[in-house]
Amino acid sequence: MDTEYQSFVETLRAGQKPEFPAHAKTIEYARELDAHDKLSQLRSDFNIPTKGSLRKKALDGGVAGETKEPRVPNGVSSATKPNGTVNSDLKDDEASIYFVGNSLGAQPKCIRQYIDAHLETWASIGVNGHFTSFDNSPLASWQDMAAACAAQSVDLVGAKSANEIIYMNTLTVNLHLMMASFYRPTAKRHKIIAEWKPFPSDSYALASQLHWHGLAPATSLIEIHPPNPTGSSPPTLTLTTSHILATIDAHADSTALLLLPGIQYYTGQLFDMARITRHARARGIVVGWDLAHAVGNVELELHAWGVDFAVWCTYKYLNAGPGALGGVFVHGRHHSFHRGGGGSGGVGGGRGEGGDGDGGDGGDGDGMALGYRHRLAGWYGADKAVRFEMEKVFWPAEGAAGWQVSNPSVVDLACVRATLGMFERVGMRALRDKAVLLTGYLEWLLLGLLADGVGKGGDGEAAFRIITPGHPADRGSQLSLLLRGGLLEGVSKELADGGVVVDVRKPDVIRVAPVPMYCRFEDVWGFITVFNRALDRCA
């Protein structure tokens, strides 16, 4: 089975479909795959919500999956029902099928240790925690925490060095900060190219940035639509690379910024970031990527691809918790810092890395006046050597850290540092290997349901279709299922009642994401079993 497992991975990596045996539809086969999964032990490092904990209505001191008896405020055992009888439903202790890591990752158990270390540091040495860390602490001093997290992320995002990364704020705030620095419209180049169905927060950010510059989305925002998305049957919801490149060419002379998602949140489509970036930059367009669904999900080479900037969150595939700090990548060619700049007082010493002739101003003029690329500045973006000297003159910190504005939340950074350590130990290649097989197995079983006519309507219409691209190189860990009209509410309830957690997007889509760090092949089989039953009952 080891050989077969690896053969499946290699086949999928090559863009082909593996030939699963007929008995692959059984739970025994799914368990065989789990037995040969070299990453299976990672699951024990997470708190996976149980079927019982998902129904919890009040805090009781317990944590899903822990074997110790939870503490209950009124002293009644959690194994006792409200009427005083013992709850014999052992299924309450079973882990749920948690296929929603594309919305919020499961909780790593080690996060408590990191948060406790921060709280003890704060309680023990107070303000000195800004500059001091304990020898046996997993944390750096508070003012060095963001940089420590950046150092952990070099391989994760494919940066040249930690200088190209910083953790701060949350994703949309960081997107605004990056656009304030990199979207510098002129009378000739004022357009932003985006895709037709971005996450709403990105739409709000794009529109507000255009309005900030006195521009109108109707004339300055180009949305790339699928060719005839409503006229074909079934409608096309994804974008081909050639169509994206053609749109870039059509608007190249008037475009200032291209901003796309690495993975489209709704369809789960993974874009060819290397080719698109290269094509746009060759036409003088600044390229930014929203990597909310890509970091921790797929392999990235942001520096080698020449990406100007990128932003991402850490609460999805990175598992750092709801609202955790976001990440930012700024290519080294934008780090230039020339002594003698004027304007608002920026001075420096010619720092920068990976320069390719762009300098520090990106051609907008302001950078040469300031001595560095224009940005919205704040005290935490100042050079650490002078940060506490209370100077009025802004001296940017080296690299992406120079785009910081405010003191980051250390308790959030503790969570980020904890989970990044897990990615350091495992590596993205191993995670991606498992991910392509998990998703490939899920797709094969789903296609089996369609072939069997499960849930087919009276007019012969299928119960669902997979709107995520079929080629493994064109998707991450998510498969999006577009249900036949009228099925979503009933199917969603059946899934929830069966202990399955997925993301529901009205009117008709469920997003299914078996994340390789903590999801099993048995979970994939279990999802298919519950989904099959749901379609039978609701069709």
Swiss-Prot record:
Q: Name one GO biological process term.
A: L-tryptophan catabolic process to kynurenine
**Which chemical reaction does it catalyze?**
L-kynurenine + H2O = anthranilate + L-alanine + H(+); 3-hydroxy-L-kynurenine + H2O = 3-hydroxyanthranilate + L-alanine + H(+)
Q: Which GO terms describe its cellular component?
A: cytoplasm
Q: Does the keyword Hydrolase apply?
A: yes
Keywords associated with the record: Cytoplasm, Hydrolase, Pyridine nucleotide biosynthesis, Pyridoxal phosphate
Residue segments, region Disordered = 60-87, 340-363
| Record: residues binding pyridoxal 5'-phosphate | L171, T172, F199, P200, S201, D202, D290, H293, Y315, W379, N407
The GO terms this record gives for MF are: kynureninase activity; pyridoxal phosphate binding
User: What is the gene called?
Assistant: BNA5-2
Gly residues composition bias: which ranges?
A: 340-352
Q: Where is the composition biased (Polar residues)?
A: 75-87
The entry's function note states: Catalyzes the cleavage of L-kynurenine (L-Kyn) and L-3-hydroxykynurenine (L-3OHKyn) into anthranilic acid (AA) and 3-hydroxyanthranilic acid (3-OHAA), respectively.
Q: Which domain of life is it from?
A: Eukaryota
Hydrolase listed as a keyword: yes
The cellular location(s) given in this protein's UniProt record come to: Cytoplasm
Q: What do we know about how this protein assembles, alone or with others?
A: Homodimer.
- This protein's major location comes to cytoplasm
NCBIfam families, alphabetized: kynureninase (TIGR01814)
**Protein name stated in the entry:** Kynureninase 2
Q: Which InterPro entries match?
A: Aminotrans_V_dom, Kynureninase, PyrdxlP-dep_Trfase, PyrdxlP-dep_Trfase_major, PyrdxlP-dep_Trfase_small
Enzyme Commission number(s): 3.7.1.3
Which species?
Chaetomium globosum (strain ATCC 6205 / CBS 148.51 / DSM 1962 / NBRC 6347 / NRRL 1970)
* SUPFAM superfamilies, sorted: PLP-dependent transferases
N6-(pyridoxal phosphate)lysine: residues carrying this PTM: K316
